[in-house]
Amino acid sequence: MDEENMTKSEEQQPLSLQKALQQCELVQNMIDLSISNLEGLRTKCATSNDLTQKEIRTLESKLVKYFSRQLSCKKKVALQERNAELDGFPQLRHWFRIVDVRKEVLEEISPGQLSLEDLLEMTDEQVCETVEKYGANREECARLNASLSCLRNVHMSGGNLSKQDWTIQWPTTETGKENNPVCPPEPTPWIRTHLSQSPRVPSKCVQHYCHTSPTPGAPVYTHVDRLTVDAYPGLCPPPPLESGHRSLPPSPRQRHAVRTPPRTPNIVTTVTPPGTPPMRKKNKLKPPGTPPPSSRKLIHLIPGFTALHRSKSHEFQLGHRVDEAHTPKAKKKSKPLNLKIHSSVGSCENIPSQQRSPLLSERSLRSFFVGHAPFLPSTPPVHTEANFSANTLSVPRWSPQIPRRDLGNSIKHRFSTKYWMSQTCTVCGKGMLFGLKCKNCKLKCHNKCTKEAPPCHLLIIHRGDPARLVRTESVPCDINNPLRKPPRYSDLHISQTLPKTNKINKDHIPVPYQPDSSSNPSSTTSSTPSSPAPPLPPSATPPSPLHPSPQCTRQQKNFNLPASHYYKYKQQFIFPDVVPVPETPTRAPQVILHPVTSNPILEGNPLLQIEVEPTSENEEVHDEAEESEDDFEEMNLSLLSARSFPRKASQTSIFLQEWDIPFEQLEIGELIGKGRFGQVYHGRWHGEVAIRLIDIERDNEDQLKAFKREVMAYRQTRHENVVLFMGACMSPPHLAIITSLCKGRTLYSVVRDAKIVLDVNKTRQIAQEIVKGMGYLHAKGILHKDLKSKNVFYDNGKVVITDFGLFSISGVLQAGRREDKLRIQNGWLCHLAPEIIRQLSPDTEEDKLPFSKHSDVFALGTIWYELHAREWPFKTQPAEAIIWQMGTGMKPNLSQIGMGKEISDILLFCWAFEQEERPTFTKLMDMLEKLPKRNRRLSHPGHFWKSAEL
């Protein structure tokens, strides 16, 4: 029942008591279900995720509609006809659950003492006074007033508002973040201390440090007006604000200007008159007399700026303004300009330490631009050149022993999703389990704190050539590739030239002594189509077509060929409809059938044979260890070609240690499943779990590396339709993956149970749950690669997906197989996309197949077919026929199943021959929602039960 479909005439006509009660109870059931889902999203899901936030907003809007619907139904009944049961709607305790009011407050309110209608008739002040009597705090009062205001507007408008007006506008805190039940207010806001222009400019550099600090503990919002440089060539922080003047909080535009520095500003020194001090009027501050510059005026040390010359004015009583000259956009091949670095007696290094401000010291100045607390050299500045130039700006030399982060490029953060056992957000200072981490500057913060994060900067380190600075990307550390000989830090020299901004050298080297290493997703596998087959030789005998089908719109395909012909073309399977192209140096296309020495025919040449593995009932694995993510990177060996640096323990190894479970702590029970990835046992580890044992050779480094790589991919998945990963045993020879124990039966057995009725509504609900889980995995950059009904568990309407990503280690686990055999499990071929079928070969490992997001969509189409046909496609045909038909894009006869047009359209979309034509899981969800619903008839027993309750 959707209130949007209700006409105005229905809204205005009165209702009888019985009908109003029936509608209120029906809406109440929907409220109970929505509140349960809402609380699950708030407590069990990562609320910093954008998708979770969107789902929460949608549920809140629906609940507002439902409560408005109950109020409308109650309003249509005359006062004299109402009874106590109708007066109980809408229920105040359910509204308090939406607002996330504490249970202690609800317990203080006696039944019938306060109603939601009473609160709607009160003002905001009266609401606060009323609920504060029962123990509510100010935050709860603010949220309650915001929710009541939304409900009041919706109810008064009669439901004619736009969708945006249905959303509860939660109040904001002082830090500008929403005070909603998902994002609670922060007790201590992130204090951003920026540099501000002083109303008066002192005449000496020393006076730049003589000021009073602001009140301790108070947030300091000081806008960056300009950076002043004294007549001495040393870089000095700007002077402070005089006592009696308070700094202005930055406007949203100014905050954006601070966080988004220019790409290639030029720095020139010009004379600037003293700024005008701010004026006070009625306890409010006016903007300074001198308007603040735009974001392009901010100073940032990035490539492309001109040489710094001393101002022609020698009046030391005037400050020198660092401004930007108007220059066109930097081109890719623009020649880098030189920055000569000297030491000078006028530099800030020579200022006595007791005269330096703790707020505007050189450390805070640099940390403001870079976003990190840099290391300061403990040695005095060293002159890098004997000859001094009067027109160059002198700055202290860097310490050669410590890599610096002082110079960096203002670029966008490269965030990746992370999971920590215990971590603190750099921005807001609060603890977090889920969050984001920048791969460049290692910033760690909540998803909601990214807008407040400081700008990102790449580390610039020195190569052996003293004339260049080399910008390097963040280089990951492979968990199994040891680093080689460390360099001597004495080889690092001061640079006099900045590199080109848009050109990265091939000989980049890793960053020394980074706090940790980050990674790129390695869960996804590139989907590269195989090279087409060469043409048939003229001497080859044209074979007869295999399984001709009237459904195939393509020409008839030739199938049986002599094995010698395959060997001649490097064991390649021939699809005659493919246009031949010359062979390339890349890996040659592979054959999918295997030569054997028995049954010789065709002039003694052996036929090619496929080995089909029998189906095992224990093949259904009771659940799978997975928790995956987007953040494991392979080592870029080209970056290690020149030299390697010693590093601290990598973040990857730290994560593996956190998820490592000692094998001795596991209690292994009975065997519950056996598949291609190992045996699965029922066990106990702080409760019931599923334990999958992985059998690999003790000295096989490839197998161990593949296993650890998959564990790194599993550790960050958190979704109700994805099995929960709990840990892994990573000490050979005991390798195991531990997950939660899935309840219910596999979808494979449910579909084939004749006692279970699968109507359109149930099949759509199952498919929607699978699409939700797969869409989540794809959003995290994870491919399933083995999606089938045996890897999906179904229990009372809940669907859980298992075994995702484990296909990557299946190839190395079958190292002992015969080289001329292609092992195919029963029912596996019908889940493979045509582009994968064409790549099958006995000499191609299964983890090297071109799996992609499109191939997962194809596998979902097979499950969709199985839900309606209750069997696999091409069930009665041999493996050779299935390979041929699916490799050429042929499909089974759908008319024999009796599918509707809408159902078959979804299937044909998923089974599209061209992978680009297959829909995404997001689009599939929309298609499933548009399927016609089968409503119950009025004679359905459920309606009689409802009337009996009334």
UniProtKB/Swiss-Prot annotation:
The protein kinase domain is predicted to be catalytically inactive and seems to have very low intrinsic kinase activity. This low kinase activity can be increased by interaction with BRAF. The modification Phosphoserine is found at residue 474. Zn(2+) 1 binds at residues 413, 438, 441, 456. GO terms for molecular function: ATP binding; MAP-kinase scaffold activity; mitogen-activated protein kinase kinase binding; protein kinase activity; protein serine kinase activity; protein serine/threonine kinase activity; zinc ion binding. A zinc finger (Phorbol-ester/DAG-type) spans 412-456. It is found in: Cytoplasm; Membrane. Kinase activity is inhibited by ASC24. It comes from the Eukaryota. Phosphorylated on Ser-474 by MARK3. One of its GO terms (biological process) is positive regulation of MAPK cascade. It is a peripheral membrane protein. The modification Phosphothreonine is found at residues 272, 276, 497. Zn(2+) 2 binds at residues 425, 428, 446, 449. The keyword Metal-binding applies. Mainly expressed in brain and kidney. It catalyses: L-seryl-[protein] + ATP = O-phospho-L-seryl-[protein] + ADP + H(+); L-threonyl-[protein] + ATP = O-phospho-L-threonyl-[protein] + ADP + H(+). Coiled coil: none annotated. It holds the Pfam family SAM_KSR1. The active site is at 786 (proton donor/acceptor). This is Kinase suppressor of Ras 2. PROSITE patterns: PROTEIN_KINASE_DOM, PROTEIN_KINASE_ST, ZF_DAG_PE_1, ZF_DAG_PE_2. Heterodimerizes (via N-terminus) with BRAF (via N-terminus) in a MAP2K1/MEK1-dependent manner. Interacts with BRAF; this increases the low intrinsic protein kinase activity of KSR2. Interacts with MAP2K1, forming a heterodimer that can dimerize to form a heterotetramer. Interacts with MAP3K8, MAPK, RAS and RAF. Residues 531-548 have a biased composition (Pro residues). InterPro entries: C1-like_sf (IPR046349), Kinase-like_dom_sf (IPR011009), KSR_SAM-like_dom (IPR025561), PE/DAG-bd (IPR002219), Prot_kinase_dom (IPR000719), SAM/pointed_sf (IPR013761), SAM_KSR1_N (IPR046861), SAM_KSR1_N_sf (IPR046933).
